[in-house]
Regions:
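Extended hydrophobic-aromatic, low-complexity segments
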Residues: 78, 97-98, 135
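Active-site/catalytic core of tyrosine-dependent DNA strand-transfer enzymes
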Residues: 31-94
């Protein structure tokens, strides 16, 4: 439901708790023109309805979605979360996450450690977690 997700928002999308892992509502920032273009396509495709075509059941559409993500190189659906977290980390911290080939925690300056922590807390919230420790799964240490 792209209309619900973007209603009244210019710089983010709102995800219903029922759409999300862990049942937590999320607000995800829109940070690029590419994201805006994808959202425009989603609006055009779904209109005021769902991204799942009316003639398809959720289970059927999920298998189509899984195949599409596999084709683009995301071996599992969770891989999309990893990719998002790593890209978002680089944009917030100013350097790559360890899991993406960036420096490990022991290699960071004090200023970089502070940027690392702020970025991890932001990403943790965006992914629906409440603590920095969970970001190690997505970003490495």
């Amino acid at each position: 439901q792209p209309v619900f997700a973007t209603k009244g928002l210019d710089d983010s999308i709102r995800l219903k708790a029922s759409w999300c892992k862990g049942g937590r509502t999320r607000v995800i920032p829109i940070t690029s023109e590419h994201q805006r273009a994808v959202l425009a396509k989603a609006h055009a495709l779904a209109g005021s309805g769902s991204m799942i075509p009316p003639d398809k059941k959720y289970v059927t559409w999920l298998s189509t979605y899984k195949e599409a993500t596999r084709v683009i190189g995301a071996r599992k659906l969770h891989g999309l979360r990893h990719g998002y977290a790593q890209q978002r980390f680089e944009s917030l911290a100013g350097f790559k996450a360890p899991a993406a080939g960036g420096p490990t925690r022991v290699e960071l300056t004090l200023e970089q450690k502070q940027a690392d922590y702020r970025a991890r807390m932001q990403i943790s919230a965006e992914l629906g977690h409440g603590r920095e420790e969970i970001t190690a799964v997505y970003l490495g240490r």
